């Protein structure tokens, strides 16, 4: 990806695991600088999913412009590609108004796709697949994995020797493109992301404190009506467990409880555990990112630290 030049408009990315305080910090930033908030959250795109997605309340939305929330109903789907298109459109509008987009959220895939685009892989080829299947019958999939290791060691390292489906697909891409699948995946739809990005990451200095926050947060959601929220969505939209909205952390566990698959106590336990696992994945994404300005989300005077950092970047005229 070619980097935008210094004349490109600025954008601030505020990223972090769930329960790290992103939303509160976004409000503080918006009260100090001419920004508009763009949600980067795969649950907040859904209407009626307010409590479990921790949407800002109506008064905050009136005070501070928020974008990309309440886009679709819970029985609909929303892709990373759609997010990229919508986000770029919204960001262009914010910039045209002389303001700075402040992108806030924890859906790390959305952040990545927004900046890097989506890689395009060739469609399946029946003839190549038949040839690969024949070779596998003769040699076995572990031997095919060895072939893949020579052609694309990066991808082979991620695939188990008996994972026939993924081995076949990786080899198929190699044969169809003449390039390793790992190289193809780096080729993005867009050469340039037309913004200078300032990446701010909230990283907990003490993971156990973040875990305690997650437990308290989930309990608060239950206290203020998460079960009733999911019940209304289930009854009004006839959603099922395999729909994207009900695969969101918290919603899945409450849905299982409403379907009498688990008890109330188990729902709470599973909800907290799933949220902690989500936070772990989010932190893994963040630690793999480049050009990241990290702040301890548990630090005292965190808002002042981040506001001071933004001021030093001379983002605003």
Swiss-Prot record:
Function: Catalyzes the transfer of a dimethylallyl group onto the adenine at position 37 in tRNAs that read codons beginning with uridine, leading to the formation of N6-(dimethylallyl)adenosine (i(6)A).
Lineage: Bacteria, Pseudomonadati, Pseudomonadota, Betaproteobacteria, Nitrosomonadales
One Gene Ontology term from the biological process aspect of the record: tRNA modification
SUPFAM superfamilies, per the entry: P-loop containing nucleoside triphosphate hydrolases (SSF52540)
The protein, known as: tRNA dimethylallyltransferase
Entry binding sites for ATP: 16-23
Pfam families: IPPT
Family to which this protein belongs: Belongs to the IPP transferase family.
Native species: Nitrosomonas eutropha (strain DSM 101675 / C91 / Nm57)
Catalysed transformations (reactions): adenosine(37) in tRNA + dimethylallyl diphosphate = N(6)-dimethylallyladenosine(37) in tRNA + diphosphate
Residues noted as binding substrate in the record, renumbered to the chain: 18-23
Cofactor: Mg(2+)
InterPro entries per UniProt: Dimethylallyltransferase (IPR039657), IPT (IPR018022), P-loop_NTPase (IPR027417)
